[in-house]
Amino acid sequence: MQVPRVKLLMGSGAMFVFAIIYGWVIFPKILKFMISKQVTLKPGSDVRELWSNTPFPLHFYIYVFNVTNPDEVSEGAKPRLQEVGPFVFDEWKDKYDLEDDVVEDTVSFTMRNTFIFNPKESLPLTGEEEIILPHPIMLPGGISVQREKAAMMELVSKGLSIVFPNAKAFLKAKFMDLFFRGINVDCSSEEFSAKALCTVFYTGEVKQAKQVNQTHFLFSFMGQANHSDSGRFTVCRGVKNNKKLGKVVKFADEPEQDIWPDGECNNFVGTDSTVFAPGLKKEDGLWAFTPDLCRSLGAYYQHKSSYHGMPSMRYTLDLGDIRADEKLHCFCEDPEDLDTCPPKGTMNLAACVGGPLMASMPHFYLGDPKLVADVDGLNPNEKDHAVYIDFELMSGTPFQAAKRLQFNLDMEPVEGIEPMKNLPKLILPMFWVEEGVQLNKTYTNLVKYTLFLGLKINSVLRWSLITFSLVGLMFSAYLFYHKSDSLDINSILKDNNKVDDVASTKEPMPPANPMQSSTVHPVQLPNTLIPGTNPATNPATHLKMEHRERY
C-alpha cells in the first residue's frame, strides 16, 4: 500500500490540530454546556429534588466550655475552661412552601433545620451532663441594660432577683436543658418589676424562649430553632443564567438587610450555602449568606486536594480583621470610629441578635492572641478549628465541608446587679458548633461517572490522536528528507519480516582465532564411590583438554 508523503503530512497535521482543538476547546465547552442544562433548580430536575429535601443528614457537633472556677470568676479571677464534647446530632435540612417565579427565574422557600440527638456517636456523653455557663438570661440582659438603658437598671435588677431568686452569675444545668429542653422562667409574680422584665418574653423579643403556659417560659439556646422556620429565602433558579444559580436575592422578603450602619454590609452576597453554581473560577471564592450572623461570608482557595480519588479544591474562611480591612468597617458600631470595631478574628453580633454576643472561630483560631491569653483552657489549631470546603468547580459540588463557629459573651462588670458587679471584662467563650458533611460514594459516583469518566475518555482520546499524528509527521519528515514520493508500508513490513527470519535461522559464527583442540582419551579410573555422593557417570569420561603449543 502506497501512502503519498503529502497526504501523510496533511493527514497527520490535521489529526494533530483536531486533537488540540477538540480535546482542549470543543469537548470542555460541550461538557460545561451539558452540566449547565442539568444543574438548575427547575421543578422536576434531580438537582431541585436533592436541594429541596436533602436525603441524608449533616453532622452537627456541639462543644461546650465548662467554667471550672465560677465563684472565683465572679470575683474577677481569670476563667478556667474545660471543653466538653462533642454532643453529636443528625441535622436534617428541608425547604417548604416553595414558590417559583418563572419571569424572574427565582424560587422562594422557607428553610427548616431539624436536630436529632445521636446517642451512639456522642458516647460516652449522654446529654445529661451538668455544665456551668454564664447565666444565659441574667448576664446578657444585665450587660445590655447597662449599655443601652442604664436608667432602667434598678428596675431590671429587682425584677431579676424575683424571676431568678438566689441566682448567681454562673448557672449549673444539664446540657439538654441549656440547649434544647429549656430552663424555667417563672413570670407568675405580680410585682411590677417582675412584670416589666417578663414583658420581653411575652412580646417575643427573647427569640430563644418558648411559652408553655400563661406564666412560664422555657429558655434554651437552640430549642426554638429546632424543626422551625429559620428564615424565608428567595434565590435564583439558574435556568436563564446558570452563573446565578442559588444566588440570594431576598431574605425575609427584603432585597437587603437593615442591620448594619453601612449599606454595603447589608447586601446579600452568594448563595444560601446549600447549592453553588457550576463552572466557578477558583479565584472567585465561595460566598454564602449566613442568617445567624446577618452577614455574607466568603471562602477562598488555598490548595488542590482530593476526595475519594477525585480532584478537588480546598477553600477556607475566617472572620478577618474588621479594624484593619476598610471594606469591613461597616461591621463596626461606628464605621468612623475604629475603637468600636471588635478584636481581630471576632464579630459583634449585638446588632444581629440583640445581645452582647460575639462570634469567632473555635478557640479564637486566627484571632487576636490576647483573646486566648485572657482565659485558660484554649488550644487553637488548624486541624480542629479551621473552616474548610473541598469543592469540585466544574460541577459545583462540595465533596466535604466543616463549618465551625464559636459563640462568646462580651462580658463586663455590672454595678447595678449584685452577682455581676465584680466580673472581669473579657470575651468569654461559651460554646462552639460544627456543621459537617461528607458525601458518600452513592453521590460522589454520580460526579465520578458523569464528569470524571468523560474527562478521562477525552484525555485518552486526545493524547492517542496526538501520538498517532506525531508518528505520521515523523514518517513524513523521513520521506521528505530522503526525497521519496511515498511510503510503501507493505515493503517495510516485508523487509522487517525478512530481517526477523534471518535473525532466527542464522548459524552462530566461529571464533575469530580458533585454536586447535584435541580430545584426551579417557583414563580408566577405579570404580570408587565417595561417601555422600552418587554420580551417574564418571566425570572424567567427558573431560576435554586444550592442546597448547610449547615455545
From Swiss-Prot:
Glycan-linked positions: 66, 213, 226, 440
Subcellular location field: Cell membrane
GO molecular function: scavenger receptor activity
Gene Ontology biological process terms, A to Z: cell surface receptor signaling pathway; cellular response to pheromone; detection of chemical stimulus involved in sensory perception of smell; lipid homeostasis; pupariation
Residues in compartment: Cytoplasmic: 1-7, 481-551
Transmembrane segments: 8-28, 460-480
Keywords, in A-Z order: Cell membrane, Disulfide bond, Glycoprotein, Membrane, Olfaction, Receptor, Sensory transduction, Transmembrane, Transmembrane helix
Disulphide-bridged cysteine pairs: 265-330, 294-352, 332-341
Keyword Lipoprotein: no
GO cellular component: a single term: plasma membrane
Family designation: Belongs to the CD36 family.
Name of this protein: Sensory neuron membrane protein 1
Organism: Drosophila sechellia
